[in-house]
């Protein structure tokens, strides 16, 4: 994929900093959460506070992918991320960076061969370590930030600085190049190999454990499958969307 500069990503990122973000694009605080309100100051990025209690379980969206796959990067940045912005309060995202890689046990050590070469294996481990070491939403946003960039490895530091400045890129790279990175990749290999039905390609997307054949339908699928009494506003507007054809 020919990736664009930071500008397109920033157009989406600006949504996170708007003083009055639409309800469908925010993490709502439960009533009486004075502690969260006190600690979340006006200049902070307050996406990681407690959310309101849901009247039904969130919709589970799982993405099985590999870090340098063009189609995976497109789905992550252009489909999954915008959907999360709009309906984050009713969806739960799981990322599994491994994809079409292969593993083998060599003298008791797991070695990996990745579809797009050694760099992809390294970046898969980096993203696995982000998911292992950071809070879930911070890891997701950092990975989206990296996947938007041309040189993902060099952008690890700036993306961490944007969302979790207290975490150093050196600590993530230490994980990725060490024993923990190998363990995480092996775990992701097992998760990927256990898929039923097996994945046919990447990105392989599951919505409530069922494959999503049309990535463009992610938002509508999440809205449809959520069984709660209150849905984000965007779900109501989608229900009133015009037909694709006009009958005579």
Swiss-Prot record:
It comes from the Eukaryota. Keywords: Disulfide bond, Glycoprotein, Immunity, Lysosome, Oxidoreductase, Redox-active center, Secreted, Signal. The keyword rRNA processing does not apply. Its main location: secreted. Residues 1-24 form the signal peptide. PANTHER family: GAMMA-INTERFERON INDUCIBLE LYSOSOMAL THIOL REDUCTASE GILT, GAMMA-INTERFERON-INDUCIBLE LYSOSOMAL THIOL REDUCTASE. This is Gamma-interferon-inducible lysosomal thiol reductase. It comes from Rattus norvegicus.
């Amino acid at each position: 994929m020919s990736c664009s500069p930071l500008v397109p990503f920033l157009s989406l990122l600006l949504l996170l900093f708007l003083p009055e973000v639409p309800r469908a694009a925010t993490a709502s605080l439960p009533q009486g959460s004075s502690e969260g309100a006190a600690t979340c100051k006006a200049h902070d990025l307050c996406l990681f506070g407690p959310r309101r209690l849901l009247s039904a379980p969130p919709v589970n969206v799982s993405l099985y992918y590999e870090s340098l796959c063009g189609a995976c990067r497109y789905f992550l940045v252009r489909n999954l991320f915008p959907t999360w912005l709009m309906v984050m309060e009713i969806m739960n995202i799981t990322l599994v960076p491994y994809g079409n890689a292969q593993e083998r046990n060599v003298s008791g050590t797991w070695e990996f061969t990745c579809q797009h070469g050694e760099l992809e294996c390294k970046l898969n481990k980096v993203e696995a370590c982000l998911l292992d070491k950071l809070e879930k939403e911070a890891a997701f946003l950092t990975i989206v930030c990296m996947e938007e960039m041309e040189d993902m490895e060099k952008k690890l530091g700036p993306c961490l600085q944007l969302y979790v400045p207290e975490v150093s890129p050196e600590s993530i790279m230490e994980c990725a190049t060490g024993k923990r990175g190998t363990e995480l990749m092996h775990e992701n290999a097992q998760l990927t190999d256990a898929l039923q039905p097996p994945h046919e390609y990447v990105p392989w997307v599951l919505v409530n454990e069922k494959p999503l054949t049309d990535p463009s339908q992610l938002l509508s699928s999440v809205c449809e499958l959520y069984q709660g009494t209150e849905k984000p506003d965007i779900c109501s507007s989608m229900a009133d969307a015009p037909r694709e054809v006009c009958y005579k």
